[in-house]
Amino acid sequence: MSFETFKFTPEINKAITESGYTEPTPIQKKSIPEILQNKHVLASAQTGTGKTAAFVLPILELLHQDKNKVRGPRVLIVSPTRELANQITDSVRKYARHLNINSATVVGGMSYKLQNKLLSKPLDILIATPGRLLDLFKQGKIKFKDTKIMVLDEADKMLDMGFVPDIRKIFNATTKQQQMLMFSATLDNSVSKIASEFLSNPITISIKPDTKGHSNIQQSLYYVDNQFHKQQLLKHFLADTNLNQAIIFTATKRQADKLTDDLYHSDFKTAALHGDM
């Protein structure tokens, strides 16, 4: 299957090609057709499997098809952390580069003056963290009457971080007629319970992780004093002459890019690999 199967508008297909992608991932293959049919979706897949593009791409297609001009936001994407919200923003900008789509991000740590300026203009997509979004709503800076799609990204993290009460208040401020999408790395009873509160007859999609064990992997735990100590210890291990290749996992895409740059300048032949590439 190729991305052309989804019959995206040429502008979206062009952005996908420019990003170097040729074939959708399993979560994208199953989620995109359902979202394009305006269905509620509850989807689960491991981190790094293309979950963000699984909802961003069909959302952009639906926005492109809808020519009605409203103040917006027409799409509301809620993420548990500032960093994850910024990653979604990067993805939206990448795939919407050839479309006339307006997006903005409001997260904690940004000045209210800047965010108020962003919200003063018509918006197609708003990406936000729960606390700041609820705060701006209470101030009357944003309304959800035009919101047609609402995405809850990393739902399991939202549960862990105690954001459900905020999400509930935000949801209750909408028309409750919007298409609801919920994406999560895990799909346990607590996530399913929250989904039953916000989603109506959702299509449930679960991509099972590869859990095969490997007996030839040795595991060790090292304690470090700080970030600098961790970096130096990592470089010490990588300098081992018996080591030919290594794979280093980071928590976020930005950390992967930063570590790649640091190791490159320390004379290690290094390359990053993540979902934005």
Language-model-derived ranges and their functions:
Residues 2-277:
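Conserved helicase RecA-like core
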